[in-house]
Structure formats: structure tokens, C-alpha cells
Amino acid sequence: MKIAVLGDSDTVLGFRLAGVHEAYAFEETPLDIERLKNKLNELIEREDVGIILITERLAEKVEIPDVKLPIILQVPDKSGSKLGEKALREIVRRAIGVELKR
């Protein structure tokens, strides 16, 4: 099974250097988001792809389907993880009833 990466150019470069051959770079332009959607659907349909890694930032721009295989995981990009920050804000909001904002 192959691993595929969908992300910004820096993230993709890092994964290519780590040996991932199926790595595709996208910007956040409308044209690239459309290309991203098409590539994600193409990778999901392929039987030789077992894991798809997509940066959190790009994952926010597309609908991630709920499929058993391939496994689709969100990874942070060079700006860091947003998921941990969101989870922490929700915990604080529930605990003290106040939403924290930057």
C-alpha cells in the first residue's frame, strides 16, 4: 500500500525527502482547491493507496469523505497544528463558560 500526501509545497518537499513518492503540492487558490478535490477523489478510488495525509489547512477547504480505506489523516503544516488549539479552546469554554479568542 502506498502513502500519498496532499499539502503545501514545503510540507510536500519534506515528505518527498522522507521517501514518499505520491506527494502533491497545492496552493489555496480556487483553481488549486478544485485540483485538490479531484486529486483527493482520485486517490480514494485507487486500490494501491492505503494512507492519505492532507494538511489541516487544505483539509478545511474540502469535504473529507468518511471511508474505511484509504485512511485519511490530517497533519499540521509549517504554521503548526490548529486542531490542538481548537480542542483546548473547547475544553476551556466548557470548563469556565467563556470562549477564548486571539
Swiss-Prot record:
Main location: membrane
A cellular component annotation (GO) from this entry: plasma membrane
Membrane topology of the entry: Peripheral membrane protein
GO MF annotation terms: ATP binding; proton-transporting ATP synthase activity, rotational mechanism; proton-transporting ATPase activity, rotational mechanism
Pfam families in the cross-refs: ATP-synt_F (PF01990)
Database matches in InterPro entries: ATPase_V1-cplx_f_g_su, ATPase_V1-cplx_fsu_bac/arc, ATPase_V1_fsu_sf
Family annotation (Gene3D superfamilies): ATPase, V1 complex, subunit F
Keyword Ion transport included in the entry's annotation: yes
Keyword annotations: ATP synthesis, Cell membrane, Hydrogen ion transport, Ion transport, Membrane, Transport
GO BP terms in the entry: proton motive force-driven plasma membrane ATP synthesis
Location(s), subcellular: Cell membrane
Family assignment from sequence similarity: Belongs to the V-ATPase F subunit family.
Subunit structure: Has multiple subunits with at least A(3), B(3), C, D, E, F, H, I and proteolipid K(x).
PANTHER family: V-TYPE PROTON ATPASE SUBUNIT F, VACUOLAR ATP SYNTHASE SUBUNIT F
UniProt function note: Component of the A-type ATP synthase that produces ATP from ADP in the presence of a proton gradient across the membrane.
Name of the protein: A-type ATP synthase subunit F
Lineage start: Archaea, Methanobacteriati, Methanobacteriota, Thermococci, Thermococcales
